[in-house]
Curated annotation (Swiss-Prot):
It comes from Nitrobacter winogradskyi (strain ATCC 25391 / DSM 10237 / CIP 104748 / NCIMB 11846 / Nb-255). Pathway: Lipid metabolism; phospholipid metabolism. InterPro entries: FA_synthesis (IPR003664), Phospholipid_synth_PlsX-like (IPR012281). GO terms for cellular component: cytoplasm. Catalyzes the reversible formation of acyl-phosphate (acyl-PO(4)) from acyl-[acyl-carrier-protein] (acyl-ACP). This enzyme utilizes acyl-ACP as fatty acyl donor, but not acyl-CoA. It comes from the Bacteria. Pfam families: FA_synthesis. The keyword Lipid biosynthesis applies. One of its GO terms (biological process) is fatty acid biosynthetic process. This is Phosphate acyltransferase. Belongs to the PlsX family. Homodimer. Probably interacts with PlsY. It catalyses: a fatty acyl-[ACP] + phosphate = an acyl phosphate + holo-[ACP]. One of its GO terms (molecular function) is phosphate:acyl-[acyl carrier protein] acyltransferase activity.
Amino acid sequence: MPQKVRIALDAMGGDVGASVVIPGAAISLNRHPDTEFLLYGNGALIEAQLAAHPAMKAVSRVIHTDVAVGMDDKPSQALRRGRKTSSMWLAIDAVKKGEADVAVSAGNTGALMAMARFNLRTLPGIDRPAIAAVWPTLRGDSVVLDLGATIGGDAHHLAALAIMGSAMARVLFDLERPTVGLLNIGVEEVKGGEEIREAAELLRSLNLPQLDFIGFVEGDGIGRGAADVIVTEGFSGNIALKAAEGTARQIAEYLRSAMSRTLLSRIGYLFARGAFNALRGKMDPRKSNGGVFLGLNGIVVKSHGGTDAEGFAYAVDVGYDMVRYDLLTKINQTLNRHGHTLAPASAVQEALS
């Protein structure tokens, strides 16, 4: 395990770029002083931000490039124009070369996935990477995947997601045998499509010591924390993620409107301010920022493109944790034992936009 965690940052990624990336990384550095940074992007813009963060500057190396992947670029365009020259590619390439332990970017999701997969390649037994993230629930946190890396997938693909997600849960939640559920339209064994029923049978037959497969979980089970790990293919996973984010914003707006409607409600808010602040903190999407690309020969973390510095700091924190607690080793240990059962999926369409 490295004495220092070396993090490569795509300083040009996201809606704003360096003015969020550098302050965000500085916040994370305060929490994890055993961190060093490689900063890829426009050197002048990066140095201007570093001037306000001397502690960050002291542990950073700036690698200049004028090429940045646009948020609207198609993955094929990003690969064609930005391969080997863009800030996004160079950050990923630093992981491949062993110069960094993890790459973090707030850039274009499709381009980041395409570049990461093209450069790092997938692990043995893994046909498609997945995006996994921590999801706040009523009983704590869960790992949910896939949140949009691929569309569709057969039973072997879903079983591979379960293995990788359980490894992430063991790392983050310090669990010996995380519970794993497959997202479905019902909990009965006869519910759902053929692929998900076959995945359930495969996971039961494997009886892996690293995870406790509990069967199917319905949509409301995500928020209830019905399992430590909830597995689905990327189409439904991304819909679930966006629906949850929208619901959180809707509830926050309802509360804000209700608490400011009358003088009496404003007075009531003053008495309940502590409870409302706790609720706001629990629902803050910034604290769940940072989707991990699982299934690659290296660790890549995707931040929301429109986040602020505090939100980006949480994405950097996720990358730090994945390295410090040796996520790749834990995934590989399981795949080495059971990878022969996870033959590549035959019909999985990659989501590149």
